[in-house]
Amino acid sequence: MPASLVVQKFGGSSLADADRIRSVARRIARERAKGAELVAVVSAMGDTTDELLALAEAITDEPDSRELDVLLATGEHQSATLVSMALHAIGVPAISLTGAQAGITTDGRHGRARIAGVEPRRIRAELDAGKVVIVAGFQGVSQAASQDGETTSETTTLGRGGSDTTAVALAARLGAARCQIFTDVRGIYTADPRFVAGARQLSVIGYEEMLELAHQGAQVMQTRAVELGWVNDVIIEVLSSFEDAPGTLIAEDPLVEQRNKVRGLAHDRNVAKVTLVEVPDRPGVARSVFEPLADAGIIVDTIVQNVGHGGATDLSFTLARADLAKAKRILEPIARELGFRELTTDSAIAKVSIVGAGIQNAPGYAARMFGALADAAINIEMISTSEIRITCLIAEDQLEAAVRALHAAFELERPDELGEGTGAVGAAS
């Protein structure tokens, strides 16, 4: 019997061309040679997803969500079959499976479906037959009863980063020893190394800290994947596809309470701010604003309401930049109905966050963060916090300077005194 089962996930940059696909096949073969059973989850090659989306938008400004999911899922189908062919070419038995063939079921929300369950019988049978199983990530199948009582199946996609979620969900359901996420960086860093030359790779980071970093813009891991790993106690390794070097382990960190420090910075350019000026200050108005946005699937982040004067107040909130136009269309008639004086927007902004379990255990973190930004002449427009995170909204053209100032202020280039090998966190936009 094989010693263990390993799930590996390869992102688009790892599969960008035929040479890289062959390199991925060799990496899979090396792991299999150690005696492990292998399931590999693959993203679409390179920029394939963006290219397919652009093609759809060249046909129509508003592609049907069902048809768009069917189209986008083909990118992962292509990768899975090519990786399987590459394995066959070097003598490794393999089979490619779509998300549906792999037993991944989802809810019916096209473009942002959530995994409802995994039935891995087909995967298990192929593993028992001695094959490496290559699964198309980012997708699944929803099932619903039609009007005539028949069950209909529809292809769904999981949203950006959905292949991470596929990999962790399969690792949890199959009882994998670990889930390896191969990407174009070595792991999780204290900040984006493109901004900070001294950014340091982390050897280990806890689920909670990683989840906050992912939520605030660190794009190495998708947030839902981290959540699934945390809930199911899946050990996740973030590794480079292009070099054999130690990565970052995402797992329960027994020293998290003792570290008492900021672990990393995250940033996000995909932000826009909406301000409703002189909103009537009465019960029910906030609901009238935010309920239609929620119904449209728009996620609102930071919310700030000024102290009311003269029966009116200003209400500001942030959302994903891609949702700004839709939000304006929804809010403009509401503004006329409720009597706002003005609706303003700003998309030239960004978020920068400090993250660490130590924030809840010691005073002074907020003061140091705000002081570092002030010393760099960076104005803070909005602030939000959680138990382990402080986020500031700033002008986008000051983002890189902010990241460098905060990295220096919290001395993140220094190794952790409790023990920290080299590893990787804050890469984002």
Where in this protein do the model-derived segments appear?
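A conserved regulatory-domain signal marking ACT and ACT-like small-molecule sensing domains
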Residues: G247-S429
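Short phosphate-binding/catalytic loops that engage adenosine nucleotides
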Residues: A36, V92, V234, I298, ...
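Nucleotide/pyrophosphate-binding catalytic subdomain
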Residues: M1-V226, T318, L393-A395, F410, ...
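Terminal amphipathic helices with adjacent charged low-complexity linkers/tails
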Residues: V42-D50, Y189, V238-E257, G311-A312, ...
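Acidic-aromatic/histidine active-site loop/patch
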Residues: G229
